[in-house]
């Protein structure tokens, strides 16, 4: 078969499997997820061996340290993947939940009930844990899932998908409920994006180029999981010790993830007192600083920041820094250069914090805490499918409920329309 025919067959099988999944009880879905988790742990040596192939090829191709970190699987990360499946099993099942019910003057009872979306296509790059996380969330929400990972993780993704599918089939679920597109070139993606009769939603997770390619070529609705140009604004009433802890955590804990800090904004009234202090600390942690003229006047070791730096998602130990006149300029900067991901303000002024929350155009706005909390688990959603920077149909970290939609249910007693 041609690539087009194979992808069409995968999509058709997923559509058929989605009808089976939509009828599964919560108990059966949970048993399925627990079996998948156990299988991952049992097959950990095999997964590590397959992942080693991807890591070696990545090193030979010169992948960045951040990309290699995203790609790497070890016993600890595999155990974390399995635990994530168990956590999804423990979450409330949204399918079948009646979210609203009201009575009409003619005594009709009208409600809205959560139902699966159907078939979800997920296109991602070098993060093999997405294979397990996405499968777990989609299946718990009653959806079939078609995965297309990047070539950097092809061996890891094939191994994970095969293990999960085997566990799934052993529980009587059709194999088509979890599919992996076996092609790593763009033609496979293009064919996937044409399957509007079988796939209900596409979720791309990756770099700017991938997001643009998918958005421009898809016949299917797309929820973008765009880059994370995350900001922290140190306001004039900020507690410096608190600001230090938050900035260090947001920038250095895991710089290669989308909720890491990329741009630091500092109110001019505290710049002279705070910048030398934070610049010294970050420099000692090997963070490269790129600042505007006012920032560099107080931190001469910083490199000049260009216009491109304000838009940059570095995913490395690099931080763009700017001194702003006031809260207005901080908000304007974020709304101009941000990517609708996560922004934080450090302040002791409740009113200014509330204004920041209201006026910043972002899917997650944080007060006096790290941007690293923009994560489904950290926010109490359980595992997430990603962080949506698209306002329709979901905005911010996407959990189980965001993988469902609603349908109207109407109860009558013989009513007819007059």
Curated annotation (Swiss-Prot):
Transmembrane segments: none annotated. It comes from the Bacteria. One of its GO terms (molecular function) is NADP binding. The keyword Cytoplasm applies. Its main location: cytoplasm. GO terms for biological process: L-proline biosynthetic process. GO terms for cellular component: cytoplasm. InterPro entries: Ald_DH/histidinol_DH (IPR016161), Ald_DH_C (IPR016163), Ald_DH_N (IPR016162), Aldehyde_DH_dom (IPR015590), G-glutamylP_reductase_CS (IPR020593), Glu-5-SA_DH (IPR012134), GPR_dom (IPR000965). It catalyses: L-glutamate 5-semialdehyde + phosphate + NADP(+) = L-glutamyl 5-phosphate + NADPH + H(+). Catalyzes the NADPH-dependent reduction of L-glutamate 5-phosphate into L-glutamate 5-semialdehyde and phosphate. The product spontaneously undergoes cyclization to form 1-pyrroline-5-carboxylate. Belongs to the gamma-glutamyl phosphate reductase family. This is Gamma-glutamyl phosphate reductase.
